[in-house]
Regions:
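N-terminal export/targeting signal detector
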Residues: 1-9, 14, 137-140
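Short linear sequence motifs
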Residues: 1, 9, 64, 113-114
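Acidic/glycine-rich phosphate/pyrophosphate-binding loops and surrounding catalytic core
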Residues: 88-144
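A general marker of short, structured functional hotspots
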Residues: 4, 67, 116-117
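Compact, glycine-rich, soluble single-domain proteins
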Residues: 7-98, 103
């Protein structure tokens, strides 16, 4: 069986590098399934979950990665994902995310309109909200 080489990179380094059966990317245009033999393409990543399925020889398990922004470069036998933000759903600590969100909101309240730091804290709050949404969705529906 053909395999798809996948590299998943975020700003702090390489998150994953190895073969997968297929993956479903979240893009601004919707979801995009990628299997071996896919046409060459570069897509902008949206906010949501990239769903990855391991090779059957590796157990065929699925794992989800929450992403926000970035790009994916696809060719016939591989995909390189360069995500602005990325975290495996299994690695999300809801209490830590809530704490980070509260701190960002406190800082946001202290920053005046027009201050360049405002965009940073707003982005941090959006990222935390996205993480919490996925944790809530996963526990409510019993996903993966």
């Amino acid at each position: 069986m053909a395999e798809l080489n996948c590299q998943f990179v975020r700003p702090d380094g390489l998150m994953f590098d190895g073969p997968v059966d297929h993956l479903i990317l979240v893009t601004y245009a919707g979801e995009l399934g990628v299997w071996t033999g896919h046409a060459a393409e570069i897509v902008a990543l949206g906010d949501g979950v990239v769903r990855t399925t391991a090779l059957q020889s590796d157990g065929g398990h699925e794992y989800d990665v929450v992403v926000s922004g970035g790009y994916a470069e696809i060719d016939d036998d591989g995909v390189i994902i360069l995500a602005d933000h990325a975290r495996r759903v299994d690695d999300i600590d809801p209490d830590k995310v809530r704490e980070t969100r509260e701190l960002a909101l406190e800082h946001l309240d202290q920053v005046e309109e027009g201050d360049h730091r405002r965009a940073y804290y707003e982005s941090k709050v959006r990222w935390c909200n996205l993480l919490l949404k996925q944790v809530t969705k996963g526990s409510a529906s019993g996903q993966r």
